[in-house]
Curated annotation (Swiss-Prot):
Pfam families: HD. One of its GO terms (molecular function) is magnesium ion binding. GO terms for biological process: dGTP catabolic process. It comes from Shigella boydii serotype 18 (strain CDC 3083-94 / BS512). This is Deoxyguanosinetriphosphate triphosphohydrolase. Its cofactor is Mg(2+). It comes from the Bacteria.
């Protein structure tokens, strides 16, 4: 096991215009303050205020948006980070681990990773992801790329269909088709930060949001040693070279994770479990009394000093006996949140310290709050009650189905841009309006300038006489469409769909 030295992980250099020379503690902290400014002032963060956490198109300001959720995650992440550093200080480990002058950057990286953790999520959350992936699967059929004979290939895109005698190109076709059918919010977050927003963050800060280490084009089984770290796609083919450089700069082995990402993940797990239940009460899906009984029933028999008793029962009893001039709902969730944090944050911090050799190496193949402990059981309790009584509620399911239809419908509306030949689309990009393509011209005008420029830059770097050029061009054209639609807010996607389907009143 390599020696633990966080100076080798908290890399304050950047991809472009990186600070040079040896820096003092204060100068390094200023570099990460610059990261904070770039992140907080970015449009991607502002858009989170119109993407909802559980209830799409929610107009009740008391119900969480992705932004308010991310701010809560940021605070919990800060709490865990401070707890870790405090315990390390007591154990006289800060200097031994190279953290004595990096406590500020340590906290800042965790906080900003928490704030950014949802920036790549499309409208309507997981149903938006599913809509994008299903739409592309129905056209690219990545599973057919593994089949024989080649005549069985149902891919509707001629350039990406497998061909006899073109095995090197066929392998690229397989990768592209697999990649495009595995849109994922975390991978899109990496793409946003580096390619679309060009935020030029420090290597360490980007490492903090690389939650999953599996490439989106991965085919086959994942290694047992990394099955948790690779359970979802973490980055796309378009960012392959950037991630390779990131691994080098952060001393990460293949498919390994940056150490501080475990803290961000734990903060998210703690935050959303309680928040989803509180939002459900706000939405009148159930009362706080009904929620308590759901929790009690799901936990089952327990002793007086059990974690359930100390956290949930304690919150319930205090909320009913407290004389504060606050509603029972407000008091219950205040105590539930405080009790949960006071138990789970120290536990997560200690798990981080206890497993630091594997975490520092990036190979710890679990979440911090995923084990056989009561703390893990408490999180599972919150999640299971939410799945059973919130996510399966008819109102929630109807909104999710509507969201799926909106995203699928928008992709179908913009499909003519993907149907153009390479030469025709190139002409449209250069001229922006082509008389013989009136529909395609108008659709192209609706795409954001940022996304169009990202496409142009990516394609312009490719040698046009390359045999792979048509494949890569089509790949980046698909990315252009995914970038545009996934970057919409819930309400914008809903309104755009209604306008283009001519149902706007």
């Amino acid at each position: 096991m390599a020696q633990i030295d966080f100076r080798k992980k908290i890399n304050w250099h950047r991809r472009y215009r990186s600070p040079q020379g040896v820096k003092t503690e204060h100068e390094i902290l200023r570099i990460f303050e610059s990261d904070r400014g770039r992140i907080i002032n970015s449009p991607a963060i502002r858009r989170l205020q119109q993407k909802t956490q559980v209830f799409p198109l929610e107009r009740n300001a008391a119900v969480r948006t992705r932004l308010t959720h991310s701010m809560e995650v940021q605070q919990v992440g800060r709490y865990i980070a401070k707890e870790i550093l405090s315990r390390m200080k007591e154990l006289k480990l800060l200097e031994a681990y190279g953290l004595d002058e990096l406590t500020g950057p340590f906290e800042s990286i965790v906080e900003m990773s928490c704030l950014m953790h949802d920036i790549g999520n499309p409208p309507f959350g997981h149903f938006g992801e599913a809509a994008i992936n299903d739409w592309f699967r129905q056209r690219l059929h990545p599973e057919d790329a593994e089949s024989q004979p080649l005549t069985d290939d149902r891919c509707s895109v001629a350039a990406l269909r497998l061909r006899d005698g073109e095995e090197p190109l066929n392998e690229l076709r397989r990768k592209i088709r697999q990649d495009l059918c595995h849109f994922e919010g975390n991978a899109q977050g990496i793409r946003l930060v580096h390619t679309l927003m060009r935020m030029n963050l420090t290597w360490a800060q980007v490492g903090g949001i690389l939650k999953y280490t599996r490439p989106a084009w991965w085919r086959g089984e994942t290694p047992e040693t990394h099955h948790y770290l690779m359970k979802k796609p973490g980055y796309y083919l378009s960012e392959e070279a950037y991630i390779a450089r990131l691994r080098k700069e952060l001393n990460l082995a293949l498919y390994s994770r940056f150490p501080l990402t475990w803290i961000m993940e734990a903060a998210d797990d703690i935050s959303y479990c309680v928040a989803d239940l509180e939002d459900a009460v706000e939405k009148r899906i159930f009362t706080v009394e009904q929620l308590y009984h759901h929790l009690h029933e799901a936990w089952g028999q327990h002793e007086k000093g059990s974690l359930f008793s100390l956290v949930v029962e304690n919150a319930w009893e205090k909320s009913r006996s407290n004389s504060l001039s606050r509603s029972t709902e407000d008091q219950f969730f205040m105590y539930l949140r405080v009790n949960t944090l006071n138990k789970l944050v120290p536990y997560a911090a200690q798990r981080f310290i206890d497993n630091l050799p594997a975490i520092f190496a990036g190979t710890f193949n679990h979440a911090l709050l995923e084990d056989a402990s009561e703390c893990s059981d408490l999180l599972k309790l919150y999640k299971n009650v939410a799945v059973k009584h919130v996510f399966s509620h008819p109102d929630v399911e109807q909104l999710e189905l509507q969201g799926y239809r909106v995203i699928s419908g928008l992709l179908e509306i913009y499909r003519p841009l993907l149907s153009l030949s390479l030469s025709d689309f190139t002409e449209l990009v250069e001229k922006e309006r082509v008389k013989r393509f009136p529909i395609e011209s108008r659709l192209f005008h609706k795409l954001s300038t940022r996304h169009r420029l990202a496409y142009v830059e990516a394609v312009s770097k490719l040698p046009s006489d390359y045999p792979e050029f048509p494949l890569w061009e089509y790949y980046y054209r698909c990315r252009l469409l995914q970038d545009y639609i996934s970057g919409m807010t819930d309400l914008y996607a809903w309104d755009e769909y209604r306008r283009l389907m001519a149902v706007e009143q």
